[in-house]
Regions:
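Sequence signature of WD/YWTD-type beta-propeller architectures
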Residues: 1-183
Length: 183
């Protein structure tokens, strides 16, 4: 049954074996991070491209982590099971919605550490020993841009190649589309 309130909704982090050759799932489910024991909730687990680490978000409960001040990132070493609470990366404001670089040494994430209202893109480096280093905000050509922009960067995603469109292309297409009708 669903809890009476979203504040009681919590998700554990589990894994199950998968046989890619046969397209079948294993029978055993392993709980890697137990929501009941940890008194929190996990979301957005993403394995590094090299398969060594799992980066995920932890919040007090399980909905819309960017809205939770306490939300932070945690890093699990998939070889040892060790969990790093990333004290050099996390702030006292929402840190969530992450993505890995193709080389597994960098990750981008959204943080509200600046003003507490708007998510900004930060980058953190993960060295060969798995130690995360102090993040920095996405540089802007105008240093005041983030202070003057009333937009939030919620889900940064890293790409190895340039995207074949720009914001004005999306805006133009959006204006041409007919809105979905609800019946």
């Amino acid at each position: 049954p669903l809890p009476d309130s979203v504040q009681q909704l919590r998700y554990s982090l589990c894994r199950i074996a998968f046989d890619a050759n046969h397209g079948t799932w294993g029978d055993r489910v392993d709980t890697l991070w137990n929501a009941r024991l940890e008194k929190g909730s996990v979301c957005h687990p993403k394995a590094s491209p090299d398969g060594r680490y799992l980066l995920y978000t932890v919040a007090d409960y399980g909905t819309f982590p960017i809205w939770h001040r306490e939300t932070e990132l945690q890093l699990m070493d998939l070889q040892t099971g060790a969990i790093d609470s990333l004290p050099m990366v996390n702030s006292n404001r929402s840190d969530t919605y992450h993505s890995w670089s193709s080389g597994s040494r960098w990750f981008a994430f959204a943080s509200k550490r600046g003003d507490g209202q708007y998510g900004r893109v930060y980058f953190a480096y993960l060295d060969a020993e798995g130690k995360a280093h102090k993040p920095f905000v996405l540089p802007q050509s105008d240093p005041e841009k983030d202070d003057l922009t009333l937009k939030s960067y919620n889900i940064p995603d890293l790409s190895a190649t340039p995207v074949p469109f720009d914001a004005s292309s999306i805006k133009r297409i959006n204006r041409q589309l007919k809105a979905e009708e609800f019946k």
